[in-house]
Each structure stands twice: as structure tokens, then as C-alpha cells.
Curated annotation (Swiss-Prot):
Protein name listed in UniProt: Chaperonin GroEL
Gene this protein is translated from: groEL
Keyword Nucleotide-binding (UniProt): yes
Disulphide connectivity of cysteines: none
Keywords annotated in UniProt: ATP-binding, Chaperone, Cytoplasm, Isomerase, Nucleotide-binding
Length: 543
């Protein structure tokens, strides 16, 4: 297929047109008075959202060169969302502002490579300044404030996330689901939960809730399949003498072994249940070891020279309560020693620090969360499906922003921190490198200007007033139209969100500015399909 090749200024101008169209669509969602964007769906009702990355994902332009420009900035939004969970609109607005200003200078004769070098240097300096002016999140109130801002000033969402984080801890798992009612709910699962349910419904003890409940149970952990009952008999006889319930967690239990366990349960000989071990391969072995440490038990492993026949009461773990439904097993208050659990947590944290695989890191973080805290489930309620999806987007954003704030600290919000950090940087650059640095410093005003503009205020006046004021916490509250102490007003942003948004925006804008040619496919206009001939006369004898 023939290709269309465009060079230098023509190429960059066409790319800019695409970036501008994307930015104009996304920027209206910014700030407490940001507007909604209505998105047509291929089926069902249209979606309505104020989530920048959701809007960006839907933008596809007809012109192929423009679409390439938009696609690169979409990548900024997606990458920022992946890394920080929020700040997608900020990243898009920054990327557009840097590209626009840079394009003007390069068209006037500046060297793109020197300009890029200056942009990279000032970006590193501003990031260092942001970290310097940040402060750690100290209490529940600040967590609620971060979540509220990210959820478009919805205080109920902020409180919900703060409550969830208070209950499960900073490393705990918090998930977001759709509620069955119009009310928001927070359910906390204390202890450890993994995604394996009972192997047979005959193990159920609570028919109304369709779940197994074991009080003060013992826990047998085995890393292979159990098919032969003979191997299990010695430990089962010992458990029966204690009169306590037993949970068996193994790779699988099948055939004669499972059938005999079910019969013993139904006859009341032994209160017993069985589930498959979570995970696969080496990860399964690691998770079994996690459960052993949590419950104070030992994994029976043939690799360590242990057989199932050799298992004794001393090898079994203990817990206050275990709940099992068809999908999940929850261990409440395991009897493991706190020092052992802490050592295991530290070991997993060390593995997270050295792994280079995103997938491995995610799985290690799941294990860390299961060991170090419970699981909080936020159920989002709304009157309609459209409202539900929009609200769930905001809760996801707020949750990600809150985790980012806990991780790296907070700065004043509303775009003011970027301006203050930019003003504090003193660079000694010359020539086109200085032009690159100045481009970024001017672009740092763009988020605040956009927030003010969306709220109906004079963007230039507001941005200038914030810039010239020397108070570190001075900023503009667009919700009420006043200049305030941003920390006292609770208008704060995670420093990670600001940092990632700026770094990604500078990265993609500098790529666009150093582009000298574009190669794209030439779209061929296909002839329209011929009309079907008239069948005439309708369907004759049909009534």
C-alpha cells in the first residue's frame, strides 16, 4: 500500500492539530468545576464521564497524521494512569502546552535537540523541588482530603476511602465493586483472603449463606495432590481426638480421598472442609508458606523429605475462624507469631524492590497485602448504570491517588505546586537549552490556568497572583473562587501524581518536537456498495 510521507514543519503542525483536538476534549474535565464529556458507545446507552483517561481512550481522529499525534499523548495519559492512578488530565494539558510553545520556538529556528536537552534538565530540577516541598501524609483527615479532591470534590467518597485505609492499613488490599443498591458500602474482611472455594458443596455448614464456617479450626497444608485416603488417616485420627474442625489446603483433593472426607462430614464423624491451594507453580508454594506463617503451621512438602503420613498435630496451623464460600476462603486471626509474619513481610518487600517484571511485582504486592492487612471492599451505589460507571471511575481514581499520596507524600493542589516548584528552580542554561527550560517553566502554569478557566475565572490573573505570592501554601480554590492556604483548605495532591504527569508530558512533547518526518498509509476511498435491486410487489401470498 502507498505511504504518505510528510517532512519538518508540515509534519509537526499536523501532529499538533491532533494533540490540540485531544487536549480540547480532555481539558474540560479538569478541576472541581470541570464539565462532563458524553461518549457514544457502539451498543447501549452513551457513557458520561469526568475521568480524563476514559475520555482520551475514546478519541480516534479521521486524519492519520493527526491521529498519530493524539495517540502519542493518549499514551501519556495511559502511562500516567498506570504509574500514579491519577493525573491523566494534568499530563495531557502539560504535554499540549509544552508541544505548543516548543513548536513555536522550533519554527522560529531553535535547535530541537538543544531544546529537548534543556527541557529534560529543567524537568529533573522541578521534580527534585516537588519532592523537597512535599510533606508526608500524617492522618486520616489528609487521606480523606486527597481522595475527595481526586473524586471531583465528593466528600462521601473521600471519607469512604479514608475509612477503608484506616481499617486495612497502608499495605492492605482495597477493591472497588458495584453495589446492588443506591447506597455506598464499606465491607472489611479481616485476615487473609484467597480466591479458592470449597471443593464440595457437602462441606457447607450454613445453608442460608451457602458457606462453610469453621470455628477454632486446625489447618493442614500440603503441596501435592491428595488421592489416597490411606496417607491422610494418621493425621485425621489425631484431629478427631481434639474435637476441632479441620481445613485441608492442598494442590487438589480428588477421587477416593474427597469422597471419604465428604462421607465423614455428612455422618458427623469429623467437621472437615477442603480447598485447593491458591496460585500456580512456584507461586503456589510461596503462598502456602505465607498461609503456614500466618496460621503458625508447617507446609508438608515431599521436597523437604516430609510425607503426608508423617504429619502430626504439631504441623497444623490454627485460626480463630475460617469462612469458605464457592469462590473465596477467608482466614480470620491466624495463630502465627507476629515476628515470623513481620520477617515474611520484610522478605516480600525486598523481593518487590529487586524484581524487574511488572507481573511479578503485582503478584508480590498481592501477597504482601494479604499478609500485612485485611481486605476492604468498597461497594459503589448509584441510581442508574451510567451514573454507576461514572462514579466507579471517580472512586478508582481517588483510591489510586490516595495510595500515591501515602507512598511519596503530598503537595498543595490545584496546579499551584507546579508553579511554586518551577519558580524555585534556578537554572544556569544558555542558548537553545535555556529556551527549552523556559518552555517547560511556562507550561507549568497550564494546569492552574485550565482549572480557573473551567470555573469561569480569568486564568491569566489567577495564575499570576499565585506565582508572585511567596507563601508556600498559597493557591486558588476554584470551587469557591478564593485564594486560600491550600493545606488548610484540604486542597492537596499526591507528589507522585504531579511528578509522573510532568515527566511523561516532557517525554512525549520532546519526542514530538524532535520529529522530522511522518510516514502514514494513504486511505483509499472505496466505491459505495451498489443498491439492491427492487424486489417489487412485496411478499405476495403472506398475510
Amino acid at each position: 500500500m502507498a505511504k504518505d510521507i510528510i517532512f519538518s514543519d508540515d509534519a509537526r503542525n499536523r501532529l499538533y492539530d491532533g494533540v490540540k483536538k485531544l487536549n480540547d476534549t480532555v481539558k474540560v474535565t479538569m478541576g472541581p468545576r470541570g464539565r462532563n464529556v458524553l461518549i457514544q458507545k457502539s451498543f447501549g446507552a452513551p457513557a458520561i464521564t469526568k475521568d480524563g483517561v476514559s475520555v482520551a481512550k475514546e478519541v480516534e481522529l479521521k486524519d492519520t497524521i493527526e491521529n498519530m499525534g493524539a495517540a502519542l499523548v493518549k499514551e501519556v495519559a495511559n502511562k500516567t494512569n498506570d504509574q500514579a492512578g491519577d493525573g491523566t488530565t494534568t499530563a495531557t494539558v502539560l504535554a499540549h502546552a509544552i508541544f505548543k510553545e516548543g513548536l513555536r520556538n522550533i519554527t522560529a529556528g531553535a535547535n530541537p535537540i538543544e531544546v529537548k536537552r534543556g527541557m529534560d534538565k529543567i524537568c529533573a530540577d522541578v521534580v527534585a523541588e516537588l519532592k523537597k516541598i512535599s510533606k508526608p501524609v500524617k492522618d486520616k483527615k489528609e487521606i480523606a482530603q486527597v481522595a475527595t479532591i481526586s473524586a471531583n470534590s465528593d466528600e462521601s467518597i473521600g471519607k469512604l476511602i479514608a475509612d477503608a485505609m484506616e481499617k486495612v492499613g497502608k499495605d492492605g488490599v482495597i477493591t472497588v465493586e458495584e453495589a446492588k443498591s443506591i447506597n455506598d458500602e464499606l465491607n472489611v474482611v479481616e485476615g487473609m483472603q484467597f480466591d479458592r472455594g470449597y471443593l464440595s458443596p457437602y462441606f457447607i455448614t450454613d445453608a442460608e449463606k451457602m458457606q462453610v464456617e469453621l470455628n477454632s479450626p486446625l489447618v493442614l497444608l500440603f503441596d501435592k495432590k491428595i488421592t489416597n485416603l490411606k496417607d491422610l488417616l494418621p493425621v485425621l485420627e489425631q484431629v478427631q481426638k481434639t474435637g476441632k474442625p479441620l481445613l485441608i489446603i492442598a494442590e487438589d483433593i480428588e477421587g477416593e480421598a474427597l469422597a471419604t472426607l465428604v462421607v465423614n462430614k455428612l455422618r458427623g464423624v469429623l467437621n472437615i472442609s477442603a480447598v485447593k491451594a491458591p496460585g500456580f507453580g512456584d507461586r503456589r508454594k510461596a503462598m502456602l508458606e505465607d498461609i503456614a506463617i500466618l496460621t503458625g503451621g508447617t507446609v508438608i512438602s515431599e521436597e523437604l523429605g516430609r510425607t503426608l503420613e508423617s504429619a502430626s498435630i504439631a504441623d497444623l496451623g490454627k485460626a480463630e475462624r475460617i469462612l469458605i464460600d464457592k469462590d473465596n476462603t477467608t482466614i480470620v486471626n491466624g495463630a502465627g507469631k507476629k515476628d515470623d509474619i513481620k520477617a515474611r513481610v520484610d522478605q516480600i518487600k525486598a523481593q518487590i524492590a529487586v524484581t524487574s517484571s511488572d507481573y511479578d511485582r503485582e503478584k508480590l504486592q498481592e501477597r504482601l497485602a494479604k499478609l500485612s492487612g485485611g481486605v476492604a471492599v468498597i461497594k459503589v451505589g448509584a441510581a442508574t448504570e451510567t451514573e454507576m460507571k461514572e462514579k466507579k471511575d471517580r472512586v478508582d481514581d481517588a483510591l489510586s491517588a490516595t495510595k500515591a499520596a501515602v507512598e511519596e507524600g503530598i503537595v498543595i493542589g490545584g496546579g499551584a505546586a507546579l508553579i511554586k516548584a518551577g519558580n524555585a528552580v534556578k537554572e544556569n542554561l544558555k542558548g537553545d537549552e535555556k529556551i527549552g527550560a523556559d518552555i517547560v517553566k511556562r507550561a507549568l502554569f497550564a494546569p492552574l490556568r485550565q482549572i480557573a478557566e473551567n470555573a469561569g475565572f480569568d486564568a491569566g490573573v489567577i495564575a499570576n497572583a499565585v506565582s508572585i505570592n511567596k507563601e508556600k501554601a498559597y493557591g486558588f480554590d476554584a470551587a469557591c473562587g478564593e485564594f486560600v492556604n491550600m493545606f488548610e483548605a484540604g486542597i492537596i495532591d499526591p507528589v507522585k501524581v504531579e511528578r509522573v504527569a510532568l515527566q511523561n508530558a516532557v517525554s512525549v512533547a520532546s519526542l514530538l518536537l524532535t520529529t522530522e518526518a511522518t510516514v502514514s498509509e494513504i486511505k483509499e476511498d472505496k466505491p459505495a456498495m451498489p443498491q439492491m435491486p427492487d424486489m417489487g410487489g412485496g411478499m405476495g401470498g403472506m398475510m
